[in-house]
Regions:
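Sec-dependent signal peptide recognition
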Residues: 2-8
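C-terminal motif of bacterial Sec signal peptides marking the signal peptidase cleavage site
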Residues: 14-16
Length: 296
């Protein structure tokens, strides 16, 4: 068996906190209980000692709500989500709200790749490409879920050889943890029995004003990146690495997200806004380094 990857993502909430004991959730657990592909779906709650609270469903291992305090100590749900499981299953509009993405995040051109001389055809769900794992990616399966304690959930999913066209039996183990340092930590670990490709990620949509409270255009973003990867008209990277200097892609100095989103710039037209990868500046190849900051 091949140990593919161990990935850890951190989100630090730096705000004034006051301890809260009652649930902040605005959704009902029973509205998230159904059966999908013979497996039960449910809703889980994570909390830390500072009052941060997160609700999660095992359908797609999705974050449904995430309550954090603003600078004045007022708690708001800062992720976009639905109030029942049916809206996730029979989605209209955005499919990936709060979800785990796999086997492969982002687009694979024409849904094709070659590995060790073998050609693989994936399911097409973003014509002409395969996006975020295909027609039935990890966002549309029920994960086996174990509540470790009040602030930690453990998920497991076994993806069969050939699922959505990908080679290898793949076992994915994932942990969501809400720490007392106000970090949301996502840990991925995957093991395969065959050479394959994999790119796991998390897909929450954040709004620091609170879900439903306007846009993020006035959120001030800093990206520690001198370059980005331009895309073609179907959002496949061209292979180039372009400087952000003098373009709307330059967030090295903190800038409101919406300041230049409507600029006459071809990359923004292709993406209908920002839908790109930035190449992060790094001092070393290992360890954590500052990637980005955002505040309202």
């Amino acid at each position: 068996m091949k140990n593919i990857s161990v990935l850890i993502f951190f989100i630090m909430i730096t705000s004034a906190c006051s301890k809260q004991t009652d649930s902040l959730s605005k959704v009902n657990r029973k509205d998230f209980q159904t059966v999908v592909d013979g497996k039960n779906t449910d809703l889980f709650i994570l909390k830390n000692k500072n009052g941060l609270e997160m609700t999660v469903t095992n359908y797609g291992a999705r974050v449904v709500e995430f309550f954090v305090p603003d600078r004045n100590g007022k708690f708001e749900d800062i992720v976009l989500g639905h109030d029942n499981i049916e809206k996730y299953i029979n989605f209209t509009g955005e499919r990936f709200l709060g979800a785990t993405i796999g086997r492969f995040g982002n687009r694979i051109a024409d849904g094709k790749f070659t590995l060790d001389g073998v050609n693989y055809q994936l399911t097409i769900n973003d014509a002409p490409n395969s996006l975020h794992g295909g027609e039935k990616g990890f966002d549309r399966v029920v994960w086996d879920t174990k509540q470790i304690d009040s602030h930690k959930l453990e998920f497991t999913y076994q993806s069969a050889d050939g699922e959505q066209g990908y080679p290898g039996n793949l076992v994915v183990e994932m942990v969501y943890e809400l720490t007392d340092d106000n970090e949301f930590i996502v840990t991925h670990h995957a093991v395969t029995d065959k050479r394959t490709v994999i790119n796991l990620t998390h897909h929450s949509f954040f709004n620091l004003h609170g879900a439903g409270n306007g846009t993020v255009n006035d959120h001030v973003l800093m990206l520690n990146a001198d370059k980005f990867t331009p895309v073609n008209e179907v959002l496949i990277p061209t292979g180039e690495q372009l400087s952000v200097e003098g373009t709307p892609m330059d967030f090295r100095t903190p800038t409101p997200i919406g300041n230049r989103v409507n600029d006459d710039y071809q990359q923004l037209k292709y993406g209908h806004g920002y839908d790109h990868n930035w190449i992060l500046n790094r001092e070393t190849s290992k360890g954590l380094e500052l990637a980005a900051t955002v505040y309202e």
